[in-house]
């Protein structure tokens, strides 16, 4: 059985995440009382023929605060039963959450006559702290639209074929901010920039013209060798520490040329020694 626990602040995309998982064969339970997690695990062990092999549950601020505080011990009970379990935590910045609630006109579950929406959003972070601290994968949805969020969940959760560490090599542009879920960040803005070549400006690091230009630059090759050498040494240590997800972010200015080229090459090199390596280009189409 595979169990995915979905949590996060209201408005961050939990419903979308559950919908994606349901569309891909998961049996989904919304707003499960946290205290029922161990019971769910026991049923999985005792009644394998009755329980769906892929289950996703959401646990959020609608739970009793006392149950949320017990989440670490409840999760440990589940894992003690050798259930393949991942915790996904979704979040966005306060301003974005406020905007989303204003646009949808939905009521936040923690608002009252004496607690404003802004206060409720802040209080929710504290309530969900015990879950956020134990998340295997954190996704910041601040800059993601509905379709990007769906694609990201598919890439990170559904492309993980077996237990073990899933590695993501992600290109990005610093002008749109660093990925908040990155574990390792490499800044490649010091390398020659194809953007300043008029004939290359409108091409990307996936295209032959840019690839040939960058491959001919000694500094680019040296940077590539250094990063791959570092990752080949240290990523297995991440895997040995029972990390479920590790994100390696490669950043240039706009996220179109240098970082894309290097992310592709680095991802391909890592696949020679590591299982489950994915490549994503965050800002390529921005």
From Swiss-Prot:
Residues the entry annotates as binding ATP: 8-15
Keywords: ATP-binding, GTP-binding, Nucleotide-binding
Pfam family, one: RapZ-like_N
Keyword Repeat appears in the UniProt entry: no
GO function term, MF aspect, one: GTP binding
Keyword check for Nucleotide-binding: yes
Residues involved in GTP binding: 60-63
Transmembrane segments: none
InterPro entries: P-loop_NTPase, RapZ-like, RapZ-like_N, RapZ_C
Protein origin, superkingdom: Bacteria
PANTHER family: RNASE ADAPTER PROTEIN RAPZ (PTHR30448:SF0)
Protein family: Belongs to the RapZ-like family.
Primary role: Displays ATPase and GTPase activities.
Name listed for the protein in its UniProt record: Nucleotide-binding protein PSPA7_5038
